[in-house]
């Protein structure tokens, strides 16, 4: 992995080309963990963010949505931000995030993991964002209900990856807040119906389940 910043733009380069022999890994592998660790190590000095600064940015983005955001979603996101603000250090980022780290956006080439489609890369993501992105994409293949999937991801982060209960829960909440904001920002504003997007109901149920678990912890 080569990385540098030119004129405020992050440049990442790879010399690998996907071939028919390249393998798409359909579950978490040590190659994913090694890649994410290297990405954090190489970008931490320029891209790591405190939890408080992330919350400030997300709150500003939320405010920009204005009256187009339906009251239930505003209340849900306001509640989530308040939960995260109680312990902002739990979501502090370690460096640059890919932003869309799913099995279809990476492949194994010999002993290396090659990652492409960096259009969502940036710094405004919480801790473990890319890891959760991968685990969430894998979990969706199982067809579980949102609440069950959220609980399963919490358990996997704790049991398999050594996160505390609060770390797992808050980082999942932050992950879903970021994706809700991204989805909302991509929608055209419609005065008669407000902002909406495909998958909004499922996202609401998932975030509600995580917030309920946060209250119980």
Predicted stretch roles:
Residues 9-11, 158-172:
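Extended charged low-complexity segments that act as oligomerization/scaffolding linkers
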Residues 45-98:
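An alpha-helical support segment within catalytic cores of ATP-dependent transferases
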Residues 19-26, 122-123, 142-144:
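Short, polar/flexible loop-turn hinges at active-site or ligand-entry regions and domain interfaces
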Residues 1-48:
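ATP-binding pocket architecture of kinase catalytic cores
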Residues 128-162, 176-192:
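Active-site activation/catalytic loop segments of kinase-like enzymes and analogous catalytic loops
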Residues 85-129:
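Active-site acidic catalytic loop and adjacent metal/ATP-binding pocket
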Residues 8, 199-217:
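Regulatory N- and C-terminal appendages and interdomain linkers associated
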Residues 22, 43-44, 167-176, 210-214:
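Phosphate/pyrophosphate-binding loops and the adjoining catalytic core of nucleotide-dependent enzymes
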